[in-house]
A protein has these predicted regions:
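Membrane-embedded architecture of ER/inner-membrane glycosylation machinery
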Residues: 2-12, 174, 293-589
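Membrane-integral, polyisoprenol-dependent glycosyltransferases
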Residues: 1-374, 397, 559-561, 568-576, ...
Length: 589
């Protein structure tokens, strides 16, 4: 149906309003909180150290850290982090996480524009908000990892290839090629293969051209996408030689075939089903509640998922409109692809989230008109959480809940967390973070009966909870687990003694060695790997690894200098600082 001029102008105005609102929401709920959490897992500092090494050495091709290792992934993330950090002269938690946050923001805007143009402006807006507020996306958007960047490049390429299809595949899809090139520089050939594979199946089902022409066109696109990355791969080969080629082969081919020389996130074929249910929270609740109840019109109930999903599959994929078909194929094919390798992580399937968000938005539109019960129950549960959490904080601060309730190996950490919470200085911002979910819950209670505002009220609830979580609770919970304070102490000791600090971590796999990544980052890449060539010095080691260290290096004497009273977030052991020296007989030799 052709829009009138007035309808077009109205649609354009709504698009700009929603776009501005989306930018405002992201600016309020993601970027202000990026630097509040210290690095507390080995994944983030491992990537950040590579960017630090780039700034320190000037080697932006294949830098090596103090441990003598090169990065396991191509350098796109490290380039972004190093570029953003260069004006400050160092990499911080905030600058390290900006690329992921920016990628999530750009992808949310692209998701909105893509679906708003091809379905409904409000539906596109809902899809973008759902995408941003799913648990998995929100978490990935605030971490220094490559996965959100890769997701942007894969989904961006898919969107651009669809637009190429709309143009009858005339010309060269330059933006799609650039997205795939950037994706290959982020993680490898998967960023080229997946967009081309999904588009091939889509075009084949649509029967837009004969099969061989589709294959040739997409092969040409893929080859063009390989040109820019080939420059870096060649330059990296000149520096890394055969070991670099072996790393590329292992990380891409052997990982997919499940024949890596070391175990890497190995899980069964069913792994992604529960992981997806968890990653889609809180909207998994809505999907669950939509099964129950009857439509408003009193018709015999049919499962909601049949509205635009199962029924259309049974009637034939070709009966779907092209946007729905393309979205469905993107979900199905990417999901199946990542189920094949043994190596599986929740973030691998992030590229299906924008398309799932579109279907969830369509479900919301149906539920709002026909089954608001499902939305109201979802909102009621979220509102209950929004009320309970602040009162839980009050109970801890008033001493109604005692640290003695905790038992097990994390009892000390949890008790320390409660003590921090009880002793916390409640300034204006922290009070705001605590009451934000209450304000959102009150708004929901005033509007939950209004079926035209209930979806809006649910989004406000979710954002209120995330603001409280990111602004207050996650830093409070996770920062005590970070190795940052240990790194500060080791820096002091190194400065006082005028000697470097060495580190030892026992690893059963030489191809995937563990390190104190977090300590090394906060020591500005000045933590040296112990290899037995040193005559004397000081070394940090986990209490369980100490026996392995003594057995591996019998020519040395290790004496504890200081118990650091901390369980490392990288190696999961209590760590201590030791002095070491060669035994007299060995020293004479």
């Amino acid at each position: 149906m052709i829009e009138s001029s007035a309808e077009h102008n109205t649609r354009l105005t709504r698009t700009w309003i929603y776009l501005a609102l989306l930018i405002f929401i992201v600016g309020l709920t993601i970027f202000p909180f990026l630097g509040l959490q210290d690095f507390n897992t080995k994944g983030e500092p491992r990537e950040a150290v590579v960017a630090s090494t780039m700034l320190e050495t000037g080697n932006w091709i294949l830098p090596r850290n103090n441990g003598g290792e090169t990065a396991y992934k191509p350098p796109m993330l490290h380039w972004c982090v190093a570029t953003l950090s260069a004006p400050l002269g160092k990499v911080s938690e905030y600058t390290a996480r900006i690329p992921s946050a920016a990628a999530a923001t750009v992808l949310a805007l692209m998701t909105f524009l893509f679906f708003a143009k091809r379905s409904d402006v409000q539906l596109g807006f809902w899809a973008s908000l759902i995408f941003l507020t799913t648990f998995e996306v929100h978490r990935a958007a605030a971490t220094c990892r490559v996965d959100m960047l890769l997701t942007l490049f894969i989904v961006g390429a898919l969107f651009q290839l669809y637009q190429w299809y709309e143009r009858d595949m005339k010309g060269v899809p330059l933006l799609a090629i650039l997205f795939m090139s950037a994706g290959m520089l982020a993680k490898g050939p998967v960023a080229v293969f997946l967009p081309c594979f999904v588009t091939f199946i889509f075009l084949w089902i649509q029967s837009t051209e004969v099969l061989w022409r589709i294959v040739l066109r997409l092969m040409g696109v893929a080859l063009l996408a390989l040109l820019l990355p080939a420059i870096w791969y060649y330059a990296a080969y000149l520096q890394g030689g055969e070991s670099f080629l072996q790393l590329v082969y292992e990380e891409n081919v052997l990982r997919f075939l499940g024949k890596m020389t070391y175990a890497s996130h190995e899980n069964g074929w069913y792994y992604y089903f529960p992981i997806l249910a968890a990653g889609l929270l809180p909207y998994t609740l809505t999907l669950l509640f939509s099964i129950f109840g009857r439509p408003r019109n009193g018709a015999k109930y049919k499962p909601v998922v049949k509205i635009n999903f199962v029924r259309r599959i049974t009637e034939g994929l070709r009966s779907m409109n092209s946007v729905e078909l393309f979205s469905f194929l993107s979900i199905l094919l990417i999901f199946i692809f990542y189920c094949i390798p043994k190596s599986k992580r929740s973030v691998y399937i992030l590229p299906i989230y924008p398309f799932l968000s579109f279907y969830i938005a369509k479900l919301f539109a149906y539920l709002r008109n026909e089954k608001p019960f499902a939305l109201r129950v979802t909102g009621a549960l979220l509102a209950a959480i929004a009320f309970i959490v602040p009162f839980g904080v009050l109970a801890v601060c008033e001493g109604w809940i005692k640290p003695s309730i905790f038992h097990g190996k994390h009892a000390v950490e949890n008790a320390f967390l409660m003590q921090n919470l009880a002793a916390m200085d409640f300034g204006f911002l922290r009070l705001l973070f605590i009451i934000a979910p209450i304000i959102a819950a009150v708004y929901y209670l005033f509007h939950f009966r209004d079926r035209f505002r209930i979806v809006q009220a649910i989004f406000i609830l979710v954002f209120g909870l995330y603001i409280s979580l990111e602004g207050l609770f996650l830093p409070l919970i996770l920062n005590p687990r970070s190795d940052k304070n240990v790194a500060v102490r080791l820096e002091q000791i190194s400065h006082q003694t005028q000697h470097p600090v060495y580190a030892y971590v026992h690893s059963t796999d030489a191809n995937n060695p563990l390190h104190f990544f977090t300590i090394n980052f906060y020591m500005r890449n000045r933590l040296h790997a112990f290899d037995g060539k040193q005559a004397e010095g000081q070394i940090i080691v986990g209490e369980e690894d100490l026996k392995q260290l003594e057995a591996q290096y019998p020519a040395f004497v290790f004496i504890q200098k200081e118990d650091l009273h901390h369980r490392s977030c990288d190696v999961g052991q209590n760590i201590g600082l030791y002095t070491f020296a060669r035994k007299a007989a060995d020293a004479q030799l």
